[in-house]
Amino acid sequence: MIIPDLHTIMPIIITGVGALVVLLCGPLLLSGTTSSIAAVTAAAAGLWAIFTAPSAVPAVAGLTFTPLAQFLIPLFCAAALLTLLLSHGYNENRAIKGEEYPATVLFALFALCVLPCASNLLILFLAIESVSFAFYILVTMDLQRAESGEAGLKYLLMGAVAAAFTAFGFALIFAGSGTLELAGAVPHADNRAIVAAGWGVVIMGMAFKLSLVPAHLWTPDVYQGAPAPVAAFLSTSSKVAAASLLLMLLTFSPPMPELRIPLVLLSLLSMVVGNLAALRQQNIKRMLAYSSIAHMGYLTLALLTGTREGYAALLLYGAIYTAMNLAAFGAIASLSLEKERDQIADYSGLGFSAPLRGGVLALAMLALAGLPPTGGFIGKFFIFYSAIKGGETALAIVGIISAAVSSFFYLKVVASLYMHRSSSPAPRAAAAADAVALCCAAAFILLLGVFPAPLLRLVDAALQ
């Protein structure tokens, strides 16, 4: 390795150094400065990744800036940046003070940047678990709410189980293949059984991370108890990271028919159970939690195809889903400055009294339902198209039906925003940071709905 090689992993270095600076120097800085430094750090890391050419040469042992990393790192940085912007006004009205919050967001981003660059199983495991550790802390940050601590404890306990599954699975893959390198951890005639078993255990571990049924029970409580901006970051970046881990392993592995049945069951149950459970929810965060279970079922369907089209659909939908959930939870956070608005009924008439935030929330609901001309429609179209083309027609039909059913509970939120009046006073005006973040997420959703070609080209390049 020579020093110039390090420029390809500068996003990792930038986020790591930025997190340490915010944490160590925070007590010496003015209030609010740490959040600004963290936001600039996330933006700088994302821009560096965009303008750095991928390389097949490892920058350091175990870390290579691949085309996939060039796609995912800016996505993670954008999610972290919008989360920090949305957190500014929300945290001022909560007991979430000091430099710990922005520093922990940057530590999570650091691990997220490491993950797509990893070229061996050990670094991959450390990266995905470091992401989880950061979120255990972030979920419990709202000290004024007992639900926040309860959510963090539940997430920690379930995360420990997921970590055990993942570690055991990687150990089996290592035992069978004799190497930690991703390129060498493939099944052969003499080691197929043990490597396939390792794969099965890793999939179960990632099922916890992705909230796939039956490993989904922690999700509604954690989303409900977490601060809304944290729920936005958790429901997007951690999910895309877990799906990307499976994608990275699959791209190095030949098809393994024995894994098809577990993936089919995980996808089928998640799409059906997630959407049916969401129908009964009156709490908007729990509704979005169950809907995220269904959306992860769609991602698993794309992964199941084992085709380039399926993997492209996974990355495309991951990017669009990030924007949709950031918009949804961001609007919830901005509308909950004075008090938590947990129930769908709490949003009655807010489409008129808070038109920007109500409009963004309505747009996010329409996009999550997959209605045109939003990015959600484009994402679902490519998911189901790739599934049908990959021979999973029956599962695609189930997915289409479940997506149609989901329109009911998404439109229920839109109806509450615009078809009901409320006697409650209008919410406080949106902070400038909230407005910028929400407008960026909404613009991304709309632009991808009418002009998805640029993102499709980026996805194609990421799979080279």
From Swiss-Prot:
InterPro entries: NADH-Q_OxRdtase_suN/2, ND/Mrp_TM. It is a multi-pass membrane protein. The keyword Transmembrane helix applies. It is found in: Cell inner membrane. Belongs to the complex I subunit 2 family. NDH-1 shuttles electrons from NADH, via FMN and iron-sulfur (Fe-S) centers, to quinones in the respiratory chain. The immediate electron acceptor for the enzyme in this species is believed to be ubiquinone. Couples the redox reaction to proton translocation (for every two electrons transferred, four hydrogen ions are translocated across the cytoplasmic membrane), and thus conserves the redox energy in a proton gradient. This is NADH-quinone oxidoreductase subunit N. GO terms for biological process: ATP synthesis coupled electron transport. The chain crosses the membrane at residues 9-29, 39-57, 65-85, 98-118, 121-141, 156-176, 193-213, 230-250, 259-279, 287-307, 312-332, 358-378, 394-414, 436-456. It comes from Citrifermentans bemidjiense (strain ATCC BAA-1014 / DSM 16622 / JCM 12645 / Bem) (Geobacter bemidjiensis). Keywords: Cell inner membrane, Cell membrane, Membrane, NAD, Quinone, Translocase, Transmembrane, Transmembrane helix, Transport, Ubiquinone. Its EC number is 7.1.1.-. The lineage of its organism: Bacteria, Pseudomonadati, Thermodesulfobacteriota, Desulfuromonadia, Geobacterales. It catalyses: a quinone + NADH + 5 H(+)(in) = a quinol + NAD(+) + 4 H(+)(out). GO terms for molecular function: NADH dehydrogenase (ubiquinone) activity; NADH:ubiquinone reductase (non-electrogenic) activity; quinone binding. NCBIfam families: NDH_I_N (TIGR01770). One of its GO terms (cellular component) is plasma membrane. NDH-1 is composed of 14 different subunits. Subunits NuoA, H, J, K, L, M, N constitute the membrane sector of the complex.
